[in-house]
């Protein structure tokens, strides 16, 4: 006999003392314990915990990962010990991001950031401490100019001299003329694309140039007779279906 979570055996050592631990609101968490071990409910056994003090770390915020727990001696992420983390001061400050008196942790991994609260977030993928720009793993974005760095939209960022797709440098992109490709939906109007961008000379998919693509006419539209989205310019179809509605659109716009 054993306890199971989502069909997976937890390998509980002492079934009489086993319990699923709750958060401060009384909801079940991903953690359990018996008098010998702690358990992360993916099946990870944490031996030799301090039974009296082993507890989930509640983030005291609506959206939290539930990935962290501690006893009075150690901190754990998904059942793995975080070496050097201070259990007395450790807390979850954002989804999967931990903080103690020493540093910030991303998914249980120590980072070079000392104080999460001193960071400014750019979009959802970048941070700044006023000296450097950091990606989601808190690695420095090499070459980024803090004074001119900005979030364009979604996955796109730039400074005075560079463009990035997430944390990848888009080589050859001109930040003065760069913009994400406009997306036109017959159902929902217009938006900007996560993955396609262009400047005055080139078109890019993520961080790579699309050879021979025509920047002036490059578009993304969901024609009603196409296969979902059609990505095209006046000369080529790069994604989707070369449909009658596309041909009609090109003829009306470019006479071809």
Regions found by a protein language model. Give the residues of each.
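Non-catalytic tandem-repeat scaffold regions and their flanking low-complexity/translocation tails
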Residues: 1-256
């Amino acid at each position: 006999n054993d306890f199971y979570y989502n069909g997976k055996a937890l390998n509980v050592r002492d079934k009489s003392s086993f319990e699923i631990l709750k958060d401060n609101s009384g909801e079940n968490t991903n953690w359990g314990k018996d008098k010998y071990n702690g358990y992360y409910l993916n099946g990870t056994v944490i031996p030799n915990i301090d039974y009296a003090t082993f507890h989930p770390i509640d983030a005291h915020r609506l959206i939290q990962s539930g990935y962290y727990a501690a006893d009075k001696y150690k901190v754990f992420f998904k059942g793995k010990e975080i070496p050097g983390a201070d259990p007395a001061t450790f807390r979850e400050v954002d989804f999967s991001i931990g903080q103690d008196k020493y540093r910030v942790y991303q998914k249980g991994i120590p980072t070079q950031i000392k104080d999460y609260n001193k960071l400014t977030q750019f979009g959802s993928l970048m941070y700044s401490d006023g000296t450097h720009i950091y990606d989601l793993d808190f690695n420095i974005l090499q070459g980024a100019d803090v004074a001119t760095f900005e979030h364009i939209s979604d996955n796109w960022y730039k400074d005075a001299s560079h463009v990035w797709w997430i944390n990848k440098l888009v080589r050859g992109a001109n930040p003065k003329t760069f913009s994400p490709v406009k997306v036109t939906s017959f159902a929902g109007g217009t938006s900007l694309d996560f993955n396609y961008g262009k400047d005055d000379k080139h078109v890019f998919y993520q961080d790579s140039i699309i050879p021979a693509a025509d920047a002036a006419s490059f578009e993304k539209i969901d024609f009603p007779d196409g296969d979902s989205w059609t990505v095209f310019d006046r000369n080529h179809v790069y994604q989707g279906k070369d449909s009658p509605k596309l041909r009609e659109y090109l003829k009306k716009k470019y006479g071809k």
